[in-house]
Amino acid sequence: MSLKNLNANKIHRNLQKKIINKKIKHLFNLFEKELRIREKFAVAVSGGPDSLALAFLAKVYSIKNKLAIKFFIVDHKLRKESSNEATKVKKLLKGLNINSEILSWNGKKPKKNIQSIARKKRYELLFSKCKKYKINNLLLGHHLDDLYENFFIRIVRGSGLKGLASLEKKNQINKINLIRPLLVFDKSDLIFISEHVFNFFIVDPSNKDFKYTRVRIRSFIDELKKEGFDKNKLFLTIKNLRRSNQTLSFYVVQNKRLNSFLNQKKNELI
């Protein structure tokens, strides 16, 4: 065996040793249950605690299941520090034998709707790379807190049932499956993993900037907690809304098929 392979095996063993921690082992088992994928996939990494935890869990999962995996770090270049941060994250991942590519959003940046446009550009970069490597599955780091925030944002916008069902564990855009295996994870758990495994994560200052709707909604949720807000009950509400939306969608499709069949029979009679 070559020295390179020996070093890789040593790193893999060190990576898997992290699972010895009782809490991380429990979280990995939960992750494994939520993911259940048996083909190659990609992981979107930003450097925040959510995506670093996702990178670690996904890497261990890929080793255990002998799956090919790609890691993409998106540098939006919206802050002067972002490129250095992306490079630091790349080196950090490399330390655990996690090879990654930095995808940069170059060109003129918008002055309005920054987060919305940045999100669109981020997906464009990720989809392009997935198609290049013939990868059909992309893992994203959305977690429980994102689910709650998204729910309240949709309420403010006056969304209907489909919108209130909020983030889906899996949906498809441009023939790429977007998979969110962390939707049952609290952010605090992801911070724990990042601190224990990497002893590092990036704190984006925009996450505290009240000019953004999501930040104001996050603050609103914190205030609700003081009034006895129960996240578990909201999770159940979103789950029920999702089931209702799925049921309604099913019968809409069935109704279309039935009408198509009846119209076909009617034309045959004519």
For each feature predicted by the language model, list its residue ranges.
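ATP/NTP-dependent adenylation/nucleotidyl-transfer catalytic domains that generate, transfer
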Residues: 173, 211-270
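Core alpha/beta nucleotide-donor-binding catalytic domains of modification enzymes
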Residues: 2-220
